[in-house]
């Protein structure tokens, strides 16, 4: 069981009744708290939880409409996402209890200060390298709309400026990361047809491709509902249309692709996790048509080239700079 869940269960008497577990891990916590419900935005966690606790977990970027008498937020990595989620919960919990649990290395000690606008926060427990904090909501805020927290910015491309709109919690919120910048300089001569932007984030790659190659069918896929919501905002800001999917890795992508383009993730929360990218490299061939291309950017220190050659085809380094490489391989 996740150590954060173990800390909650040390104080199980506090978590009886109508409780909302927010950003909960895909473990057995709901089985230990039979009256609790969950809210998550990670498609993999949602699928795992729904398979075991069908109908007890809501998915998306907005707090569920179902009523709750207390809530526990599992601390996310991004401070601005924590602010949004705490606001959404506190606005519904006037006079009631709001809890925050997280790992010490995830910054729980500092994040606990984000409870102070709602009342006097106190630490209830410290164990398993985690902390549990609680506040009685004395000052319930007005709920802030998620769209009002969107952060638009412009990037200059060969065919003119592109507006990118990112939401709290999305990778490289409010700015273009170096890996995507290098990949955007190397999107020439892509195979025409169906193109997948894998791990689309705020949608910068998919939107740039759709505008540059308007006759291509562009699919944008991410495991995070805040990312796919951002991608939809980016498409709308540029008057573009594409299919946006929220799903867990390459298994959620369609078959018959001509191109897979990616700046793949390698973090889940505060933890390093290469599983989604390695799964992509192993299964890309199944999703590509013959002659289809996988093109991705990765940090220099990540040894993806042997995996690509083993599972996709001959791999070349198309470009490199700023600590990143562009890899390209075509399915025979």
Curated annotation (Swiss-Prot):
Keywords: Cytoplasm, Methyltransferase, rRNA processing, S-adenosyl-L-methionine, Transferase. It is found in: Cytoplasm. The keyword Transit peptide does not apply. One of its GO terms (molecular function) is 16S rRNA (guanine(1207)-N(2))-methyltransferase activity. It catalyses: guanosine(1207) in 16S rRNA + S-adenosyl-L-methionine = N(2)-methylguanosine(1207) in 16S rRNA + S-adenosyl-L-homocysteine + H(+). This is Ribosomal RNA small subunit methyltransferase C. The keyword rRNA processing applies. It is an enzyme of class 2 (transferase). Pfam families: MTS, MTS_N. Specifically methylates the guanine in position 1207 of 16S rRNA in the 30S particle. Belongs to the methyltransferase superfamily. RsmC family. InterPro entries: Mtase_sm_N (IPR013675), rRNA_ssu_MeTfrase_C (IPR023543), RsmC/RlmG (IPR046977), SAM-dependent_MTases_sf (IPR029063), Small_mtfrase_dom (IPR007848). GO terms for cellular component: cytoplasm. Monomer. SUPFAM superfamilies: S-adenosyl-L-methionine-dependent methyltransferases. Its EC number is 2.1.1.172.
């Amino acid at each position: 069981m996740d150590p954060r869940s173990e800390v909650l269960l040390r104080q199980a008497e506090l978590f009886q009744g109508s409780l909302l577990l927010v950003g909960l891990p895909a473990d057995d916590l709901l089985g230990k708290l039979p009256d609790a419900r969950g809210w998550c935005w990670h498609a993999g966690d949602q699928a795992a939880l729904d398979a075991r606790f069908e109908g007890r977990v809501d998915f998306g970027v907005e707090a569920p409409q179902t009523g709750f008498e207390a809530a526990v937020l599992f601390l996310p990595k991004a401070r601005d996402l924590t602010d949004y989620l705490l606001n959404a919960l506190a606005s519904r919990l006037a006079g009631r209890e709001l809890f925050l649990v997280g790992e010490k290395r995830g910054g729980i000690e500092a994040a606990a200060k984000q409870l102070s606008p709602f009342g006097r926060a106190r630490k209830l427990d410290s164990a398993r390298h985690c902390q549990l904090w609680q506040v009685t909501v004395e000052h319930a805020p007005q709920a802030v709309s998620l769209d009002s927290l969107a952060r638009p910015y412009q990037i200059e491309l060969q065919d003119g400026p592109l507006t990118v709109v990112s939401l709290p919690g999305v990778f490289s919120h409010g700015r273009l990361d170096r890996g995507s910048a290098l990949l955007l300089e190397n999107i020439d001569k892509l195979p025409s047809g169906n193109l997948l932007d894998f791990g689309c984030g705020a949608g910068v790659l998919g939107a740039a491709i759709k505008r540059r190659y308007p006759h291509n069918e562009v699919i944008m896929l991410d495991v995070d509902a805040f990312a796919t919501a951002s991608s939809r905002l980016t498409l709308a800001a540029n008057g573009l249309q594409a299919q946006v999917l929220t799903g867990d890795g390459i298994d959620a992508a369609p078959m018959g692709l001509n191109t897979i383009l990616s700046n793949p993730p390698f973090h889940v929360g505060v933890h390093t996790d290469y599983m989604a990218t390695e799964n992509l490299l192993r299964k890309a061939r199944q999703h590509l048509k013959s002659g289809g291309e996988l093109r991705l950017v990765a940090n220099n220190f990540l040894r993806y080239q042997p995996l690509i050659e083993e599972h996709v085809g001959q791999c070349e380094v198309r470009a490199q700079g700023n600590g990143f490489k562009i890899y390209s391989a075509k399915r025979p």
